[in-house]
A protein has these predicted regions:
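Structural recognition of the beta-strand scaffold that forms the well-ordered cores
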Residues: 1, 36-41, 46-48, 81-86, ...
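Conserved SGNH/GDSL esterase-like catalytic core that processes O-acyl groups on lipids
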Residues: 1-64
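Surface-exposed intrinsically disordered loops and tails
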Residues: 6-19, 102, 129-133, 138-157
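Generic structural signal for well-ordered alpha-helices
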Residues: 25, 66-71, 112, 116
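Active-site segments of SGNH/GDSL-like serine hydrolases
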Residues: 41-45, 71-110
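Extracytoplasmic/secreted cell-surface and envelope-processing proteins
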Residues: 46-56, 91-99, 141-143
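Substrate-gating cap/lid alpha-helix
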Residues: 90-136, 165-170
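Histidine-centered active-site loop/cap adjacent to the catalytic His
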Residues: 152-186
Length: 186
């Protein structure tokens, strides 16, 4: 997937990104005895003050969109697992084509309880299918942005949003551990 997507881009619709994902999965996931796991990390672009499609999304809107995406995946692929990965930290100077800044970072953090609440709700209606993955990368990148995120020039000075090679490897490890731990419990 490309950078810059929001939950709005993935809402269920014939022309939406989720339809493309579903079509691709149906092409390669032909052995129904194999576990199918979807890892979702959306929210960074939703939190922007201005810019990406649909932004800014407030917590209840974010929750509604994540739920719609999850419901569609569970409907299309009964028995699949959906693992939510908490979005990562970005600097309060983040302002490229889109304006994030301090308000965006504060909004991003209001999404975290929404993800956890959805996991709790699905544990009643779809036990063991919707799980919480990584919740630690946010704090890691907040502490290690100088070594793990790319310094970029923006409208409010230097900002840190996108992982560099080291950061991408670290983020991949956080997500892999999040998936492993979520699936190990269930």
């Amino acid at each position: 997937m490309r950078s810059g997507y929001t939950t709005v881009n993935f809402l269920p619709s014939a022309a939406g990104e989720l339809s493309k994902v579903i079509a691709a999965v149906k092409l390669f996931h032909t052995d129904m005895t194999r576990l199918l796991v979807f890892s979702i990390s959306l929210g960074t672009n939703d939190s922007a003050e201005e810019g990406p499609r649909g932004a800014p999304l407030y917590p209840e809107e974010y929750r509604t969109n994540i739920k719609a995406i999850t419901d569609k995946l569970l409907d299309e692929f009964p028995g699949c697992k959906v693992v939510y990965q908490q979005p990562i930290w970005y600097s309060i100077t983040t302002y490229n084509r889109s304006r994030y800044l301090a308000a965006g970072l504060a909004r991003l953090q209001t999404y975290f309880p929404e993800l956890k609440n959805l996991v709790a709700e699905y544990s009643q209606s779809k036990p063991g299918q919707v799980l919480m993955g990584d919740t630690e990368a946010f704090d890691y990148f907040k502490e290690n942005y100088l070594t793990d995120l790319i310094p970029e020039s923006g409208n409010a000075g230097t900002f840190y949003l996108h992982p560099n090679k080291k950061g991408a490897e670290t983020l991949g490890k956080f997500w892999a551990e999040g998936i492993w731990n979520a699936l190990s419990v269930n």
